[in-house]
Amino acid sequence: MPYEHQQIEQKWQKFWDDNQTFATSDTTDKPKYYAVDMFPYPSGQGLHVGHPEGYTATDIMSRFKRAKGFNVLHPMGWDAFGLPAEQYAMKTGHNPADFTSQNIDHFREQIKSLGLSYDWNREINTTDPSYYKWTQWIFEKLYEKGLAYESNMMVNWDPIDRVVLANEEVIDGKSERSGNKVERKALRQWVLKITAYADRLVDDLDDLDWPEAIKEQQRNWIGRSKGAAVFFNVDHADAKIEVYTTRPDTLFGATYMVLAPEHELVDSIVTAEQKQAVADYRAAIAAKSDLERTDLNKDKTGVFTGAYGINPINGEKLPIWIADYVLASYGTGAIMAVPAHDDRDFEFAKKFDLAIKPVIAGGENDDVAYTGDGVHINSDFLDGLDKATAIDQAIDWLEAHQAGHAQTNFRLRDWIFSRQRYWGEPIPVIHWEDGTTSLVPENELPLLLPHATELRPSGSGESPLANLTDWLEVTRDDGVKGRRETNTMPQWAGSSWYFLRYIDPHNDHQLADPEKLKYWMNVDLYVGGAEHAVLHLLYARFWHKFLYDLGVVPTKEPFQKLVNQGMILGANHEKMSKSKGNVVNPDDIVREYGADTLRVYEMFMGPLTQSKPWSEEGITGSRRWLDRVWRLLIDDEGQLRDHVTTVNPGDLDKIYHQTVKKVTDDLENMRFNTAISQMMVFVNDAYKSDALPVTYMNGFIQLLAPFAPHLAEELWVRLGNRESISYVSWPTYDDTKLVDDTVEIIFQVNGKVRGKATVARDINQDDMITAAKADDNVQNFITGKTVRKVIAIPGKFVNIVVS
């Protein structure tokens, strides 16, 4: 009887559903294990074969930990707000909720077909009002603590359609949808003060079991640096420019200054002669994104303001320019330029014929900036000093002369939290006509997103919610009129805390029960793509730390261990994409080969964290191996083979116990590919055996179960077991069976190998010597000669010295 994967997989998926096999209890004395996948955005395309890789990894660990006696929480949900659903709705005239619901149903069906052991009773959906009630509640707490504020921020603006565009909707400076040229425009936004947590977000990375590359990306994104704030008076003006620099020791080398075109002082310091040039330049760069402006490879542009700053350390006048490579949102929006020792400043100075003054010894080429270390030159009281000493003395001088002070800075900017979109969590704020702002009362949460069938831009830059006047306009008891906030939250909001809601998803009175949070947190294993290294992971850590400060959660960090699965590439080693025609649909694989085959193949392709190309040969090879496992135990009539027996002749002892040890060790370290390799070795040896001890077959099927759960459940029952394999205790190994009872020793005559033999491991020296002298080849070299000496090392060799 062949291995009928469709019948077997449907049977056991129904069994797991009917019996709530993977429902998790909160009341147990077992140790806990909490495994979370980065939950998916339910797109219209459905799953691709990259999704099951990470999901299978967490599922294997969850099944393994259950068998090891842990109480496992392994949930799934949907990050379901997002731009694509709104774009689809605007094209079709449908509400995005309907489209999203259909997509979720499709995703759920696909995921269930993979045999993943999720507790579906804990399923969450970020668009569910019972969920986003608590997203809104967190926002209100941030607002109450002064961590949510309003500010005018630059956005992408389509001046024809009069709509704000997300960065991904702007292609080559034009709207992807309309083709109109995009401008940059200041618009009122809600902002979260993530910078208040910058130090803790850096320092606490040291306590996490995360890939070092991810931690380094977060450190770089936060960009903590120590330096100095330096104040430059503007010549002949009542104005002062503050600059932050990590190298105050190079002040003597500053030869010009640059302000961001949007800097608040530009209008007040620009001279009449330069006013038009400055205005023209600002207009020319208005549509550029921050990314375009700071591209290191682009041609440097800028305009002189006509004004000069006074270098506080030597009194020199420095021309003040504006240039797009300086951003108003970064630092103070102003820099002091030291072109002799900074590549970008050097290129700018060369293009505009500005002075270049070396202050660090070591540069030998006038055609490039010298960015290395060296002693200071041309720097007055800093001459001859090394970098560290010079920095300290420069800061001391600035502070003594009230021209600056030591300062720690961060590259991290506050989080622009609002979106001019319909399909997002409503921000629970009301703006009153008397100029005040208030939160929606907590007992009135959730503030529901109103149903709308026609989504069209407001024309004002506000979201389509501005068109829904019945929802928008409110009146207080005292007759004061107000408007609800029309911005909605970004998709990052719901994903910043969802792992907490899994713990208590049906609680109407709290975000989650404190005792349950105390039991389950932290997340023991968090698996997802490295593309979320910064934004999602940083935002989730920020919110978690804030909730910790409120006393809502018991831990400082949400995710103790993070694993990034590698990308599954097309067969040609390129990223899978519809345009390249190399996307593999997992539904097709499950239908033709089975979910267990897909699971085994994706884990066998290579180390989990490495990118790997898809291979049709590989998937068929994995299927052939599962067929071999089936045929090892089941005959052509579908019966258990006769040589599966209660008798153990001992020939599989070593390989079985080696396999249990190897697979167990590999699972603890998530080395799934080598665990499968070891199981393949065991199957090969089992095929050579005349008798298959049922205890060893049971143990092997338990090892296989996390990888191929449907097949394992079926074979487990056919081996005579009654309960589901899911909670059966993990097999153990016997250390004494891991080594051979015999050992190979070599026989030497005068130090040259003349023979070898397999002997008992505990053989004594006398018996070793007897065996050596009895060896036919050894006898050829010692017969007729005098034995001078015999050296015998137990378990190693015998050396007979003759003459």
UniProtKB/Swiss-Prot annotation:
Q: Name one GO cellular component term.
A: cytosol
Q: Where in the cell is it found?
A: Cytoplasm
Q: Which UniProt keywords apply?
A: Aminoacyl-tRNA synthetase, ATP-binding, Cytoplasm, Ligase, Nucleotide-binding, Protein biosynthesis
Indicate the principal place this protein occupies in or around the cell. Answer: cytoplasm
InterPro entries referenced in this protein's UniProt entry, alphabetically: aa-tRNA-synth_I_CS (IPR001412), aa-tRNA-synth_Ia (IPR002300), Leu-tRNA-ligase (IPR002302), Leu_tRNA-synth_edit (IPR025709), M/V/L/I-tRNA-synth_anticd-bd (IPR013155), Methionyl/Leucyl_tRNA_Synth (IPR015413), Rossmann-like_a/b/a_fold (IPR014729), tRNAsynth_Ia_anticodon-bd (IPR009080)
- Under Enzyme Commission nomenclature, its number is 6.1.1.4
| Entry protein name | Leucine--tRNA ligase
Q: Which organism is it from?
A: Leuconostoc citreum (strain KM20)
